[in-house]
Amino acid sequence: MGKVVVFLADGCEEIEALTVIDILRRGNVDVIGASINDTLGINGAHNIDFKANVTFNDINFDDVDMIVLPGGYEGRNNLLAHDGVCKVCQDFMKKNKYIAAICAAPSILGENRILEG
């Protein structure tokens, strides 16, 4: 597995975001937590503050093999409202790249007509 980006939004479920990053790093996967905010700071669904590695605009998605969308109701809403996240999801689908979505996040793929049914 090459490079993985986990999208981080305010209101995301901390365990769904950070556990993915932790497990992949333990498996020696190059994984990056990318904030969709203008800053690295994230405030999770349970009021836990943590920092991303980079912001969304710092990522060259041509070099990324997989994206991960964590759940959390507010986090899902923030990811869905971010035009860049939606565009990357659509681009990954067209390029047959990996997309993982947890909990409430698959609805982002449905809203963008990536999933049907």
Residue ranges and their predicted role:
Residues 1-95, 108-117:
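Extended, subdomain-level signal for the structured scaffold at the beginning of enzyme domains
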Residues 102-103:
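Short, thiol/selenol-centered motifs that function as redox-active sites or metal-ligating centers
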